Structures are given as structure tokens and as C-alpha cells.
């Protein structure tokens, strides 16, 4: 209860960021901002409450899942205000969010393996570097610091590198020695990295590489969908394997 009270007091602080504008029923992108904001809040409370159900070695993983959705919720409070009041894409807020949450998501792969088997710390370093390269060049392309196409290609190459490390490199080698439940969760998380994260390049392409056909509306709608899938579903997979492994302990 104390944790919930603290959490509630903290998340109540940015409510002023919601803005005073009305939400147009035909603004599906604006609606998606509000839906994702609510879902992230609910997920954050859920992950922190569920920590009490799992054994000690899984608590860190659920804490990180709660941090991912909590940080994203905080930034979505501001992003939705920017969109409703101005109709502009909240690029800076979004990349600040990703700069914090994407490395944490990558960290989850390391944590889930470390909880079940021995895994080298070098894997985390490789994934961290790959995620930062992907984000930095993605931001440079969206902010106009460098040409959109080269930034897009470099970011995608970093994403492919992370997939390789997890699917065929050190991550897969460590996963092969884990329990069936952990292996199943790991493989499901891999599919999210491959297919769920593929939604982000689609949004980037739609917003910046389609010439006159691009739009901030489509860009943000796709990005919001991607955040919903990748942040919340990712955490639910961690929660599921943590509960199963704890009950079998």
C-alpha cells in the first residue's frame, strides 16, 4: 500500500502536462496518445504490485519492467499535451523517453538470462552500444541533423546487429542452457524485437521518407502503437515467466 501511495503521488505531478485543449473524436492519433498513456499507467502499477508474487531473483526483472512503463507514462503525459495543443510531433520528448526505456528493455534480455543461467556481462555492453547507436542516428534523422536516409540505414543496421547477438550470438548460447520456460520467454521476446520493433522503422519511413506522402499524424499513430506493443507486452512476458519459475522453485 505504501508503494502505491508513493507511486500515485509521483505520477500525479505531471498532470498539468495534459493541456487544456479538447480531444477531437476524429483525431485518432490524439486518441492513441490517451489510450497508451492509460495503459502504461495500469501496467506500471501491475508490475510493481506483482513483484510480491515472484522469487527474489525475478524481482529485479519486474522492477525494470515497471520502470520502463513508468518512465514512458511520464513522457506520454507531456507528449499527448504537445500533440493536442499544437498538432506537432513531440520528437524531443519521444527520444528522451526512448533513450531511457530502450536500454532498459535490452537489459531485460540480460536479466532474464542472468536469473536462470550464467551469461557474460559483455552481452549487455554490446546490446547497450547497439541500442544507443540506433537511437542517436534515429534522432539525428528525425531532427534534421543529418539526412533522413543515411540515418535510417545506420539505425536499422544497429537494430540488425542486436538481433544477431540475441538470436545467434552470446544471448542464444546462454539461452540454450536455461529452463524450458525461460527459453520460451526468450524466444517470444526475440519475436517482439524482430517484429514489434519493426513497427518503428515503418513509422520513420512513413513520416520522413515518403516525400509529400509523409505526415506527423501517421508517424505518431504508428509510434504509439509500437510503444504499446513493445513496452507493455514485453513486460507481460517477463511477468509470466517470473511467476511460472517462482511457482516451480
Swiss-Prot record:
The chain crosses the membrane at residues 30-49, 62-84, 99-121, 128-147, 151-168, 189-211, 221-243. It presents a fast proton release and an alkaliphilic photocycle, consistent with its marine origin and the near-surface environment where this bacterium was collected. Transport occurs only at pHs above 7 and is unidirectional. Mutagenesis experiments that removed all the Cys residues of GPR show that at least one of the Cys residues in the protein is probably modified post-translationally. The record marks 97 as: Primary proton acceptor. It holds the Pfam family Bac_rhodopsin. Contains one covalently linked retinal chromophore. PROSITE patterns: BACTERIAL_OPSIN_1. Changing residue 156 to S: Lower molecular weight on SDS gels potentially due to failure to bind either sugar or lipid. Belongs to the archaeal/bacterial/fungal opsin family. It is found in: Cell membrane. It comes from Gamma-proteobacterium EBAC31A08. The modification N6-(retinylidene)lysine is found at residue 231. The record marks 105 as: Responsible for spectral tuning. Changing residue 175 to S: Lower molecular weight on SDS gels potentially due to failure to bind either sugar or lipid. This is Green-light absorbing proteorhodopsin. Its main location: membrane. InterPro entries: Arc/bac/fun_rhodopsins (IPR001425), Proteorhodopsin (IPR017402), Rhodopsin_retinal_BS (IPR018229). Changing residue 108 to Q: Changes in the photocycle.
